[in-house]
Swiss-Prot record:
Residues 156-166 have a biased composition (Low complexity). Coiled coil: none annotated. This is EvC complex member EVC. Residues 1-25 are extracellular. The gene is EVC. Residues 66-105, 151-181, 825-854, 930-992 are annotated as: Disordered. GO terms for biological process: cartilage development; endochondral bone growth; muscle organ development; positive regulation of smoothened signaling pathway; skeletal system development; smoothened signaling pathway. Residues 66-82, 957-982 have a biased composition (Polar residues). PANTHER family: EVC COMPLEX MEMBER EVC, LIMBIN/ELLIS-VAN CREVELD PROTEIN. It comes from Homo sapiens (Human). GO terms for cellular component: ciliary basal body; ciliary membrane; cilium; cytoplasm; plasma membrane protein complex. The chain crosses the membrane at residues 26-48.
Length: 992
């Protein structure tokens, strides 16, 4: 049958079919009956679909939750590795050529409703309407579509313009709420396949592609954070080595002391990383456990737990750095000035390292986004290729049906024979399509398994080579010559190694995709050959024997059927090109959204940085009194912690942006399907009547409405997740504030100690000089007398310290006993209070309301225990602090009395005149009174420097008081030593 180029080609073909029926009036009555039966069957089928569409429009959010995402992907970013971008562009061009060669069709002019509405029947569903609208119920025997566990079957958007009109009416009467709590709960419970590598997505039969790809993007961000954290630890060790060499220039790198200090830090970092990995593994295994599927709610929960654990790890690293100075002073007897200088150098170089890590994180996060876009592109190509067999099947069956209709219209084939032949062809074609699907899944999984094994092997070899490269670089490098260049060179080595690993993974993904494409093409051509055999057997063997037609006429009819199928495939190819164009537009829109997210993240980080820096500078400016060195040390520490915190928040912001796209993917996919359907309807025919034009306009209005809904949903979802990010930023800011309060407090404490030490040393030197001069000038001072005074003074100090230790231990035991009594009393009260709750529980069997009230009361009572417990601990801390202050004041008074007695006896021994002897203690008292006040106040801060005390641990109080006692004892020993010096002077005087 000849084909013209007219616009109304399909209508002309249908008229030809009706003309062919007119020469056989004897078959008019059977044809009318058959047409009525077919029309009734088609009407019932459309009624069922319209009912499903009404349900879909009434539950729009549920449908969005269950859509199979295919269009939420991004185009490759313009930033990143140029070589990688060129390779991806070449691969994308190859994939596009493959799609252009074998894009499947989508509709025919016979199956107007099923095919024009882009209804895609699953391969493993055998019961389908036949091409002419009839059906074969005998094939419907326990054959259903495979569905993901815990995921209901979803409906397509409106199946035709008519069903769209009905759906619009129903949708207008439904609720207009978009972002309700119920909608959120349903969407967060959406189930998709748990994947660990991209090749796993390619060979799966039923997957939510976009959610799987975005989950892989989240894994990439986590791997990036792990790599950067390990690099920071390695750079920290190298910087610490350089600082130790500067601090201990006489020590060699293989010195025992040097290695002991270094091994302590390395061991702490290993334990820190090991503990973090255990927590991350436990979080990964929680929730669904070993299940093959996962929900979006589980993903968001795990990402939140990951963020909390990473922040805790970051804070632990801060504490480890802060303890280095105390570690050097306490364990290795390093001077405070040298340790402080080492910390300043370490902080300054770590700031430079954080800057390098921040720049690297920004670039590699964009590179990870580029890889995600490439994965979406490759997944879309595979999706198109897998659909080509179904489109081939539909087009060939539609052409066969049309050819058999022509024979039936000419009276050469009865209706029963036509139905029997169509049923046989449908069964044979769809069974072959199912075989294609089964073989593709089976062989595809084998390809994926081999690809993953090859990737693991290659990664292991690359890791060993990179570790050897790191060792050789560190062995050859001279870090002390130019630390900045060394850090930059070391960072370049590590960054290049990370890029090599990413390139290896991407190359393996491309190789796996190419293998799957080749497999799909191979199976497709094999299936098409089988289809051709079915057609040849039908028209060259079955029809001649059944109808008695000459072989030439059957062969001519076969050629007509093939031409008709080719024409329909051409229409399908044009529609697929339109689909691909819409997909590219969607990628461009998503790319714009990602760029906006990056800009918003940059603005947020700038705001947080300016806010924190302004706060810390304002605090230091109002405090005053700190030296320039102390101020610079505090600002450096704040800058380092702030850089680390902002880098963590930036990565968390990327993860939340990914979760936003995952939440919106359902509505985006629905809107994309509506746009594709509009393009299909616009290109299906140029001759539309008024009713069809109205329905097309209704479809366009539906597209605009869904676009508006998507925009509103996107704004609300972004706002919700951005508020979560701001809350986490506030928590990190509080941690940063706590560390800076401690740092500023320590700086003020050091400043106060230095000022007090200088004043006290000056006054003590003046007083001792005066006393020594008086003793030397006295003729009554002898060696025996001075020795007797010193011995008595030592004995008195020993008794004072013993009494102080006993009183301190007794008071701490008393406080502990009181706390235990209070705890037991509170427990008794709690056990006696729930009597009313038990009575309420007695009625729990009667009404569910009583059970609910009981649960609420128990929850409130349980939550009320926390502030009570905190208040008790605070009260115990206050009591212990008060007792320790009292004991310290008593000890200080007793030591001062002993000192005054020694001075008085020494003055009496020297026969110093009474007026002078009274003047000296008075002067001493005037100097010590303000000094006592200065020494008395910083003592709780000194205890605070040791860490938060534990109420149940008496050793903390012993350590605090013990350190104080040792300080007092060393002070008195120094004074006694000065008295010994005066004794030596008297000996020299007597010898003279």
């Amino acid at each position: 049958m000849a084909r013209g180029g007219a616009a109304c080609k399909s209508d002309a073909r249908l008229l030809l079919g009706r003309d062919a029926l007119r020469p056989a009036p004897a078959l008019l009555a059977p044809a009318v009956l058959l047409g009525a039966a077919l029309g009734l069957g088609l009407g019932l089928w459309l009624g069922c679909r319209a009912g499903r569409q009404r349900t879909r429009h009434q539950k729009d959010d549920t449908q969005n939750l269950l859509k199979n995402l295919e269009s939420n992907a991004q185009t490759p970013s313009e930033t990143g590795s140029p070589s990688r971008r060129r390779k991806r562009e070449v691969q994308m061009s190859k994939d596009k050529e493959a799609v252009d060669e074998c894009e499947p069709p989508s509709n025919s002019n016979i199956t107007a409703f099923a095919l024009k509405a882009k209804v895609i029947y699953p391969i493993n569903q055998k019961f389908r309407p036949l091409a002419d609208g009839s059906s074969n119920p005998s094939l419907h025997e326990n054959l259903k579509q495979a569905v993901l566990p815990h995921q209901p079957v979803e409906a397509s958007p409106s199946s035709s313009l008519g069903s769209l009109s009905q759906g619009e009416k129903d949708d207008c009467s439904s609720s207009s709420s978009v972002h309700s709590a119920t909608s959120d709960d349903r969407f967060l419970s959406r189930t998709f396949l748990r994947v660990n590598a991209f090749p796993e997505v390619l060979a799966c039969e039923s997957v939510d592609v976009d959610l799987c790809i975005y989950s892989l993007h989240l894994k990439d961000l986590l791997h990036l954070d792990t790599a950067l954290r390990q690099e920071k630890h390695m750079m920290f060790i190298q910087i610490f080595k350089m600082c130790l060499l500067d601090l201990l220039p006489k020590k060699k790198s293989d010195d025992e002391l040097y290695q002991k200090i270094l091994s302590k830090q390395e061991k702490d970092l290993e334990e820190l990383e090991k503990g973090l990995q255990v927590k991350l593994s436990n979080t990964e295994m929680s929730g669904a456990g070993d299940s093959e599927y996962i929900t979006l709610a589980d993903v968001e929960k795990k990402e939140r737990e990951y963020s909390e654990q990473l922040i805790d790890n970051m804070e632990a690293f801060w504490k480890q750095m802060a303890n280095i100075q105390h570690f050097l002073v306490d364990q290795f007897k390093c001077s405070s000035s040298k340790a402080r200088q080492l910390m300043m150098t370490l902080t300054e170089r770590m700031i430079a390292a954080e800057g390098l890590l921040c720049d690297s994180q920004e670039l590699q996060a964009l590179d990870a986004l580029e890889r995600t876009m490439g994965r979406a592109h490759m997944a879309k190509v595979i999706e198109f290729l897998k659909l080509q067999v179904q489109e081939e099947t539909r087009c060939r069956l539609a052409a066969i049906s049309h050819g058999l209709e022509l024979l039936a219209g000419e009276g050469k084939l009865s209706g029963r024979q036509k139905e029997e032949l169509l049923t046989q062809q449908h069964k044979a074609f769809w069974q072959e399509a199912e075989r294609f699907s089964r073989e593709f899944v089976q062989r595809g999984k084998d390809l994926v398994t081999a690809s993953l094994a090859h990737q693991v092997e290659g990664t292991a070899k690359l890791t060993l080579a990179q570790e050897e490269e790191q060792r050789s670089f560190l062995a050859e490098a001279q870090p002390t010559a130019d630390p900045e260049k060394f850090l930059e060179a070391f960072h370049e080595v590590l960054e290049r190694q990370r890029l090599m690993q990413c390139d290896l993974e991407e190359e393996e993904n491309v190789r796996a995709t190419e293998a799957v494409v080749a497999l799909c093409q191979e199976l497709y051509f094999s299936t098409v050959d089988t289809f051709q055999k079915f057609v040849d057997a039908l028209f060259l063997q079955t029809l001649p024997g059944m109808t008695g037609l000459p072989p030439e006429e059957c062969d001519y009819l076969r050629q007509e059927v093939q031409e008709n199928a080719a024409w329909q495939l051409g229409k399908s190819n044009r529609f697929r090109r339109q689909q691909w164009k819409l997909f590219q537009e969607l990628l461009e829109q998503d790319q714009q959204v990602w760029m906006e997210e990056c800009a918003l993240s940059s603005v947020l980080q700038t705001h947080l940085r300016e806010d924190h820096e302004g706060t810390i500078r304002g605090v230091l400016g109002r405090l005053g009194g700190l030296t320039e060195e102390s101020t610079r040390c505090v600002l450096q520490g704040h800058d380092l912690l702030l850089r680390s915190a902002l880098r963590r928040l930036a990565l968390r912001g990327n993860a939340l942006a990914t979760l936003t796209q995952m939440r919106l993917s359902g509505k985006k996919h629905l809107l994309q399907e509506l746009r594709e359907q509009r393009a299909l309807e616009q290109g299906s025919s140029q001759c539309l009547d008024e009713h069809q034009w109205q329905l097309l306009r209704a479809l366009e209005a539906r597209v605009l409405e869904e676009a508006s809904r998507l925009e509103e949903e996107a704004q609300q979802t972004r706002l919700q997740l951005q508020q979560r990010l701001l809350a986490e930023a506030q928590e990190v800011g509080q941690l940063l504030q706590q560390h800076m309060e401690c740092a500023i407090g320590q700086a003020l404490l050091v400043h106060a100690r230095n000022a007090a030490t200088k004043s006290r040393a000056k006054d003590r030197d003046d007083f001792k000089r005066t006393l020594m001069e008086a003793a030397v000038e006295s003729v009554y001072v002898t060696s025996a007398g001075v020795s007797r005074l010193v011995q008595a003074y030592y004995q008195q100090i020993g008794r004072i310290m013993e009494d102080h230790e006993e009183r301190k231990l007794q008071h701490l035991k008393t406080l502990q006993g009181e706390r235990m009594e209070n705890y037991k009393l509170r427990k008794k009260q709690e056990l006696s209070n729930p009597s009313s709750g038990s009575r309420t529980a007695g009625g729990a069997h009667e009404t569910s309301q009583a059970v609910h009230q009981r649960m609420l009361s128990q929850q409130k009572r349980f939550l009320a225990q926390f502030p009570v417990h905190q208040q008790m601990r605070l009260h115990a801390q206050q009591q212990q602090a008060g007792v320790m202050d009292l004991l310290e004041a008593q000890l200080e008074t007793q030591l001062q009395e002993a000192e005054q007695n020694f001075i008085s006896e020494l003055a009496a021994l020297a026969r110093v005149p009474l007026a002078e002897s009274k003047l000296l203690p008075a002067k001493r008292g005037l100097l010590e009174k303000p000094l006592r006040t200065k020494r008395k106040k910083p003592l709780p801060q000194e205890r605070g420097d040791l860490g938060v005390p534990n109420n149940e641990d008496l050793a903390s109080g012993d350590q605090t008081s013990g350190s104080l006692s040792s300080k007092r004892l060393s002070q008195q020993e120094s004074e006694a030593g000065d008295s010994g010096n005066s004794k030596k002077m008297l000996k020299r005087r007597s010898n003279l």
